Amino acid sequence: MLGGLILMGILASILPIASAMVLHGLIQLTSNGYRAWLNRKDIVWAIVTTLFIGNMLAMTGLAFVAFSPDRITVLLALGLLPYVAWALPKNLALDVGKKPVGLLAGAVVVTTNLLAGVGGPILDVFFQRVQLTRHQVVATKAVAQALGHISKVIFYGGFAASAGQQDWPTLWLLCAAIISSIAGTTIGKRVLDKMQDATFFNWTQRIMLSVGAVLIARALYLMPA
């Protein structure tokens, strides 16, 4: 999730937004798909199914809306996401294990994914009250986010195709990025195995807020005087 936030910030800074969205979606689909495979025994499929239905409901509604946010909007949205998640009341009983909440989570996260390129920070909010281990959280979120990235690739694929190929990175660079994401996921799995649940949740939030601050600063810097 953290790697995806940083990667989207970099891609949004150097590529047209539609191309950045599709490229990020492909890389993160590989990363999250591999993460889900590594943790496949811990996936809670009941939650994944509910999130998927919410995704489809949101995609159906968004299919009638053609929008492609600009670079500043994406960077600002990326930076604000961790703070929005952090500012929500801690006693907010959003347990993704409950079907109505799962449907809401699926719809909200895919909408956020299409606007900012990532939905992980918001998805986190819905997992704070769920009775799962850190392995189950990571595994289930990996599948959920893979589905979200598929939706993003489908949504922005048309925009990217119409823009032509001149702004796309070379094939070797794309392959290198995918291989790096797989390597990072493998290392992350080993680190996850050694961490305690409390440490995992505490450090994730701190790092996310720090990255968010950098992205907000970048968006403000790009704003016209």
Model-derived features: positions:
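Membrane-interface alpha-helices at helix entry/exit sites of multi-pass transporters
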Residues: 17-25, 131-143
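Hydrophobic alpha-helical segments that either span membranes
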Residues: 1-6, 116-120, 139
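Alpha-helical membrane segments and adjacent membrane-interface helices in multi-pass membrane proteins
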Residues: 21-36
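Alpha-helical transmembrane segments of multi-pass membrane proteins
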Residues: 30, 50, 54, 58, ...
